[in-house]
Amino acid sequence: AVGYALQYKDSTTRMRQGTYTNHAMELFTNDNARITIANDGHVVLSNSIAFRNETTADNRLDDYEEGVHTQAPVNANLTLTNNILRYTKIGRLVTVSGILKPSAVSSSNAVQITLPFTSVADSGNTCGRYTSALMHKFVNIDDSYRNVVGYIGQNEAYWRIYHVGDNLDWHQLTNNDLSTNTEIFFTFTYHTTD
């Protein structure tokens, strides 16, 4: 028969067996706490989650985070209002969404806006690049182009916007293409190294 004991941790002793109130429960292996169930019910793991028979660390889920990031222009002469974007990070996969809304704009600097995490450095056959459809108003799209798209390159901590068109090379959007009436909504999903 397999023996077991229900134990919990209190402020004076390491482990106790029996009834408990307002104390965390911990599961130990090799004398190390591996799983903690707090008195409010949330669970803390000391390592990561492995699905099925997965043993490779790269294939384990070890991170989940939700938060906000204050967007900032990489280049000068662009000031943003409503500059908070929301993000969710699950493992190395990040999804961000927000609005780009200038409050002051001048010059011909390229429009580049910070991200909460740097994209993965990826080249060769995998060539990780990420794009976003953009809902926009009051953006000056060059007459020879059709639309604009959001873009995150490899190993970059910012996103940018490109003009796209039929049988034309990409052309990066600049501050001159925006105004204080501009609004651009975006959502990106990209990989990071963290």
Question: What is the role of each PLM region?
Answer:
Residues I99-N155:
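Terminal beta-strand-rich extracellular "head" domains
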